[in-house]
């Protein structure tokens, strides 16, 4: 194998070509490759962050759902307590009203009894005076009759 000028020219041309590629072609290619690697790495990191954010959001949503359920349960319990309280108050008011009505009815009944007794006493006294008049066959004047009726009424 002879080393001649052609081979030497080709070697120099190849060296210039390699130098030119290393100086002007290789850096933009490496820069493009590095940018592409960086974009891919950033995309992977973003995907990991998104997955973590999704997990965090799901956990947060689960916590909020649990809190909402707990709050709803508390509200329902409070409503049930309030319902029971209102029902108890209504029962107490109804019982008090019942007692009041019964007391009024008893008072009215007692007043009616007393009035009926007084009327009955007066009638008995009048009948007694009438019977006594017939027995005595004489008339008693009005003042004496009134005194006798008052005495009999007071004694009954």
Swiss-Prot record:
It comes from the Bacteria. The keyword Phosphoprotein does not apply. It is a single-pass membrane protein. Its main location: membrane. The chain crosses the membrane at residues 7-29. One of its GO terms (cellular component) is plasma membrane. It is found in: Cell inner membrane. Keywords: ATP synthesis, Cell inner membrane, Cell membrane, CF(0), Hydrogen ion transport, Ion transport, Membrane, Transmembrane, Transmembrane helix, Transport. CDD domains: ATP-synt_Fo_b. It holds the Pfam family ATP-synt_B. GO terms for molecular function: proton-transporting ATP synthase activity, rotational mechanism; proton-transporting ATPase activity, rotational mechanism. Belongs to the ATPase B chain family. F(1)F(0) ATP synthase produces ATP from ADP in the presence of a proton or sodium gradient. F-type ATPases consist of two structural domains, F(1) containing the extramembraneous catalytic core and F(0) containing the membrane proton channel, linked together by a central stalk and a peripheral stalk. During catalysis, ATP synthesis in the catalytic domain of F(1) is coupled via a rotary mechanism of the central stalk subunits to proton translocation. F-type ATPases have 2 components, F(1) - the catalytic core - and F(0) - the membrane proton channel. F(1) has five subunits: alpha(3), beta(3), gamma(1), delta(1), epsilon(1). F(0) has three main subunits: a(1), b(2) and c(10-14). The alpha and beta chains form an alternating ring which encloses part of the gamma chain. F(1) is attached to F(0) by a central stalk formed by the gamma and epsilon chains, while a peripheral stalk is formed by the delta and b chains. This is ATP synthase subunit b. It comes from Vibrio alginolyticus.
